[in-house]
Amino acid sequence: MGPCSGSRLGPPEAESPSQPPKRRKKRYLRHDKPPYTYLAMIALVIQAAPSRRLKLAQIIRQVQAVFPFFREDYEGWKDSIRHNLSSNRCFRKVPKDPAKPQAKGNFWAVDVSLIPAEALRLQNTALCRRWQNGGARGAFAKDLGPYVLHGRPYRPPSPPPPPSEGFSIKSLLGGSGEGAPWPGLAPQSSPVPAGTGNSGEEAVPTPPLPSSERPLWPLCPLPGPTRVEGETVQGGAIGPSTLSPEPRAWPLHLLQGTAVPGGRSSGGHRASLWGQLPTSYLPIYTPNVVMPLAPPPTSCPQCPSTSPAYWGVAPETRGPPGLLCDLDALFQGVPPNKSIYDVWVSHPRDLAAPGPGWLLSWCSL
């Protein structure tokens, strides 16, 4: 026997492109559903018409204009309008042409004397129960009787204004930092570096403000890769950095220590709100750099390089092993919201790559 002429060996045929596409999911919860019966809403729009009668299409358009809930993709309410017009005795059909009573496009009128009083009041819906539980006053009228029976003009409820901006940590902490971000704090004047300007003029440095008077979000440029001659940190010169990024604006208070010039203690100063957050919540992309805290009382006084104020880049010290503190006392100064990859720095220049003879005091990096 020969092979069947109708059989084919090959991939199955693709589905026909004539199939209708899938309908997207409807969203019904944009506006509050009016807590009225369909009878009350139909009677309201009919009585508001100049001739006190409307066609079915006009009733649907007027209900959409008065109640924003019915402007969405939901279409089932139109069938409820048709059902209430034909099932309630208070609605009567007014033929457009008396000779053709069965023709389409007829008008509908309402006999207000046949409307039950309870049908015009607020219904026991989830919206009304939410108002009662929350103690809030609803935007809908409690009774539509004065508008339907006495012809008072009905004003639709106004929707609440949309929020100006989305939720962000920055909005909770006082905005983006432009201007005066904290009440009562004066903006910080930028210090004039020594040696800048004309050679014949002497630069006058601006005295820095105390930590309690510094703005919440001052910005300063990062140090460039060039070497600063004559500048020393804890007795050692800073070498040229090959890892320094391009100059850009960085938060100054996140890069500065809490020590105040003049030897005063910063224990009574309020910590910055941005410094108290994990680095993943900062509004700009920064490395894991956090604001240093005051040394805890459990830190070892004989080895200052292991206290939190000196974490970052510290000079290599050669001493007996007995001077080192245990890890429990060392990590008691670490806030609970910091990870082991966060680095404590006490000076903006600490972001530069360390020179020879320097080491990172926190070895878990």
Curated annotation (Swiss-Prot):
Would you say which domain of life the source belongs to? Eukaryota
Expressed, tissue-wise, as follows: Ubiquitous.
Q: Which UniProt keywords apply?
A: Activator, DNA-binding, Nucleus, Transcription, Transcription regulation
Instruction: Enumerate the subcellular locations listed in this protein's record, separating them with semicolons.
Output: Nucleus
Q: Which GO terms describe its cellular component?
A: activin responsive factor complex; chromatin; nucleus; transcription regulator complex
Q: From the UniProt annotation, which stretches of this protein bind DNA?
A: 32-128
InterPro entries reported in the protein's UniProt record? Activin_resp_transcr_regulator, FH_FOXH1, Fork_head_dom, TF_fork_head_CS_2, WH-like_DNA-bd_sf, WH_DNA-bd_sf
Which residue intervals make up region (Disordered)? 1-29, 151-215
Which N-terminal residues, if any, form the signal peptide? none
Mark out the compositionally biased spans (Pro residues).
154-164
Sequence motif Fast/FoxH1 motif 2 (FM2), residues: 287-293
Q: Where is this motif: Fast/FoxH1 motif 1 (FM1)?
A: 277-281
Matches recorded under CDD domains: FH_FOXH
**Which intervals of this chain are the motif SMAD interaction motif (SIM)?**
327-348
Quote the Pfam families the UniProt record gives.
Forkhead
* One Gene Ontology term of the molecular function aspect: SMAD binding
Residue ranges of the region described as SMAD-interaction domain (SID): 273-354
Give GO BP annotations, semicolon-separated.
aorta morphogenesis; axial mesoderm development; cardiac right ventricle morphogenesis; cellular response to cytokine stimulus; determination of left/right asymmetry in lateral mesoderm; embryonic heart tube anterior/posterior pattern specification; heart looping; hepatocyte differentiation
Report the function annotation for this chain: Transcriptional activator. Recognizes and binds to the DNA sequence 5'-TGT[GT][GT]ATT-3'. Required for induction of the goosecoid (GSC) promoter by TGF-beta or activin signaling. Forms a transcriptionally active complex containing FOXH1/SMAD2/SMAD4 on a site on the GSC promoter called TARE (TGF-beta/activin response element).
Subunit structure as annotated in this protein's UniProt entry: Interacts with the MH2 domains of SMAD2 and SMAD3.
* PANTHER family, per database record: FORKHEAD BOX PROTEIN H1
Read off the domain note. Answer: The FM region is required for binding SMAD2/SMAD4 complexes. FM2 is more effective than FM1 and only interacts with phosphorylated SMAD2 that is in an activated SMAD complex.
State the name under which the record lists this protein: Forkhead box protein H1
